[in-house]
Amino acid sequence: KDGYPMDNKGCKIACVINNQYCETECVTVLKGKKGYCYFWKLACYCEGLPNWAKVWDRATNKCRA
């Protein structure tokens, strides 16, 4: 699955232009296929995540940044 990975507060993982950080989060930590910093949203975005990986969803948003 694809989506925005979350931190332990349920918030999207913030980034500015650091694709390497997002790639590490998505591929190494969450076992996805690829990751990058989605510039317009300023958040990491992952592709090819396993079903167990939690991704941000507007309907279930619990982020209290």
Swiss-Prot record:
A single Gene Ontology CC term: extracellular region
Domain topic, free-text comment: Has the structural arrangement of an alpha-helix connected to antiparallel beta-sheets by disulfide bonds (CS-alpha/beta).
SMART domains: Knot1 (SM00505)
Tissue distribution of the protein: Expressed by the venom gland.
Domain LCN-type CS-alpha/beta positions: 1-64
Lineage of the species this protein comes from: Eukaryota, Metazoa, Ecdysozoa, Arthropoda, Chelicerata
Protein name, as recorded: Toxin Cbi1
Signal peptide: none
Any one biological process term the GO annotation gives: defense response
GO molecular function: sodium channel inhibitor activity; toxin activity
Family: Belongs to the long (4 C-C) scorpion toxin superfamily. Sodium channel inhibitor family. Beta subfamily.
Record localization: Secreted
Role: Beta toxins bind voltage-independently at site-4 of sodium channels (Nav) and shift the voltage of activation toward more negative potentials thereby affecting sodium channel activation and promoting spontaneous and repetitive firing.
S-S bonds: 11-63, 15-37, 22-44, 26-46
Chief location bin: secreted
InterPro entries: LCN-type_CS_alpha_beta_dom (IPR044062), Scorpion_toxin-like (IPR003614), Scorpion_toxin-like_sf (IPR036574), Scorpion_toxinL (IPR018218), Scorpion_toxinL/defensin (IPR002061)
Keywords in alphabetical order: Disulfide bond, Ion channel impairing toxin, Neurotoxin, Secreted, Toxin, Voltage-gated sodium channel impairing toxin
Organism: Centruroides bicolor (Scorpion)
